[in-house]
């Protein structure tokens, strides 16, 4: 055993809403920390050796799918990208992300929320003419393509939603993910909608005007999307539409 090896404590909020006898409670697990150990590795060791009933989500293990997002010491993070060594005390408290339907323990249903958001902001390219999918898409300038790609890097992990104070007060608020998605299509020349069209979708208190600019979303996004500037640009464009009415 290495002299530098330490024992860490992982506290998990456990609860199964589908069980008539389950009650929310914290359960502690102790395990030996290994070099470069992530929370994903720790949780898998816990489930394999201590608690096979522990529920959490994962797919890619590389910070690409967003499935393993959870509250880590009160802050939303990706378990697969969070090193246990970054917590000096060695005590790590894990809870499911708020604002999403709880499935069990650390597992929440982000899929239904993002599907509903996708429909609300109509996040697909709108064309006034029927699109011939057998022909190449209309070309765009490299700068535009880069701007669209930058906003399109969202992995739908839900960290921005879980950290949003407005979302906790307004259940129907589309959050940074929704506003970023709207902005992504506003700057895409393949989408033929104008600002008035987007105003009908996000120009209210459940949309961009409900944002209190706390910018927790910007601070917690694991992909470091430019959410602050994206939301500010969207708000300015929607304000111009609102003033013209």
Swiss-Prot record:
The note describing how and how many cofactors are bound reads:
Binds 1 [2Fe-2S] cluster. Binds 1 [3Fe-4S] cluster.
Keywords assigned by UniProt, alphabetized:
2Fe-2S, 3Fe-4S, 4Fe-4S, Electron transport, Iron, Iron-sulfur, Metal-binding, Oxidoreductase, Transport, Tricarboxylic acid cycle
All residue ranges annotated as the 2Fe-2S ferredoxin-type domain in the record? 17-98
What are the protein's GO molecular function terms?
A: 2 iron, 2 sulfur cluster binding; 3 iron, 4 sulfur cluster binding; 4 iron, 4 sulfur cluster binding; electron transfer activity; metal ion binding; oxidoreductase activity
Name the PROSITE patterns on file.
Answer: 2FE2S_FER_1 (PS00197), 2FE2S_FER_2 (PS51085), 4FE4S_FER_1 (PS00198), 4FE4S_FER_2 (PS51379)
Q: Which cofactor does it need?
A: [2Fe-2S] cluster; [3Fe-4S] cluster; [4Fe-4S] cluster
- Is Iron set as a keyword in this record? yes
Q: Which residues bind [3Fe-4S] cluster?
A: 164, 211, 217
Q: How does it assemble?
A: Part of an enzyme complex containing three subunits: a flavoprotein (frdA), an iron-sulfur protein (frdB), and diheme cytochrome b (frdC).
Stated name of the protein: Fumarate reductase iron-sulfur subunit
């Amino acid at each position: 055993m290495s002299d530098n090896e330490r024992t860490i404590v992982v506290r998990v909020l456990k609860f199964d809403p589908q069980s008539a006898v389950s009650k929310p409670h914290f359960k502690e697990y102790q395990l030996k920390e290994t070099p470069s150990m992530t929370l994903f590795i720790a949780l898998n060791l816990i489930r394999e050796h201590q608690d096979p009933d522990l529920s959490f989500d994962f797919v890619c293990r590389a910070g690409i799918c967003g499935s393993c997002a959870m509250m880590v010491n009160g802050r939303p993070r990706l378990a697969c990208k969070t090193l246990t060594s970054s917590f000096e005390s060695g005590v790590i408290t894990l809870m499911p992300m708020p604002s999403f339907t709880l499935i069990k323990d650390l597992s929440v249903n982000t899929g239904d929320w993002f599907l509903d958001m996708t429909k609300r902001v109509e996040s697909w390219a709108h064309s006034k003419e029927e699109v011939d999918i057998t022909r190449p898409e209309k070309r765009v300038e490299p700068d535009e393509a880069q701007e669209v790609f930058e906003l399109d890097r969202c992995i739908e992990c839900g960290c921005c939603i879980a950290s949003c104070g407005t979302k906790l007060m307004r259940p129907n608020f589309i959050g940074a993910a929704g506003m970023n998605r709207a902005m992504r299509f506003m700057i895409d020349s393949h989408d033929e909608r104008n600002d008035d069209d987007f105003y009908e979708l996000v120009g209210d208190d459940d949309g961009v005007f409900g944002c209190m600019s706390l910018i927790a979303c910007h601070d917690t996004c694991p992909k470091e999307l430019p959410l602050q500037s994206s939301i500010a640009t969207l708000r300015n464009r929607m304000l111009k539409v609102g003033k013209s009415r």
